[in-house]
């Protein structure tokens, strides 16, 4: 699909109290105006560069810049990443762990209009292996799955229930 469709990755643990997504939102209206001025200036300066762009790579750059501007200027984007706006019962229902809060974040992003979300459930919750591929250390599968499966079941069932309760089932595959 090209670079313009590369994912925006969130690598921090959404269950951490200090969770935040870097470079989301601007502090005030003055910063938003300055960003708009910079974008306009850059567009006026890159006309010569476009004349020599035979590969069309600047089109992908334009898409990146539009996405970045949206991330910086749209308060709905910043709010979607703010899990403190969820009540404690909802956060508990998903599970107060990395996986549960990732899936809660996925639901919030769908509500904010994000069309494609991938949640990568790896990390320390997987036991001795950092992913779901246990065949290399299969003597520990039961131990790992005994922990993983209830955690996964809790988070994923909460996501499915929320998707239907909020009427998102027509937009989520």
Stretches found by the model and what they are:
Residues 1-173:
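Ligand-binding pockets and gating/stacking loops
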């Amino acid at each position: 699909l090209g670079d313009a469709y590369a994912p925006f990755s969130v690598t921090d643990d959404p269950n951490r109290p200090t969770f935040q997504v870097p470079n989301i939102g601007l502090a005030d209206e003055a910063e938003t105006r300055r960003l708009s001025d910079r974008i306009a200036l850059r567009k006026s300066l890159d006309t010569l560069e476009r004349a020599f762009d035979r590969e069309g790579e600047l089109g992908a750059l334009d898409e990146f810049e539009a996405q970045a501007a949206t991330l910086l200027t749209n308060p709905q984007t910043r709010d979607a990443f703010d899990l403190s706006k969820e009540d404690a019962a909802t956060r508990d229902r998903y599970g107060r762990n990395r996986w549960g809060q990732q899936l809660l974040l996925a639901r919030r992003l769908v509500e904010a209009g994000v069309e494609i979300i991938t949640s990568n459930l790896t990390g320390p919750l997987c036991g001795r292996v950092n992913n779901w591929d246990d065949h290399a250390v299969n003597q520990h599968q039961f131990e790992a799955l005994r922990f993983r499966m209830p955690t996964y079941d809790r988070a994923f069932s909460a996501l499915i229930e929320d998707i239907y309760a909020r009427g998102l089932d027509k937009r989520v595959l």
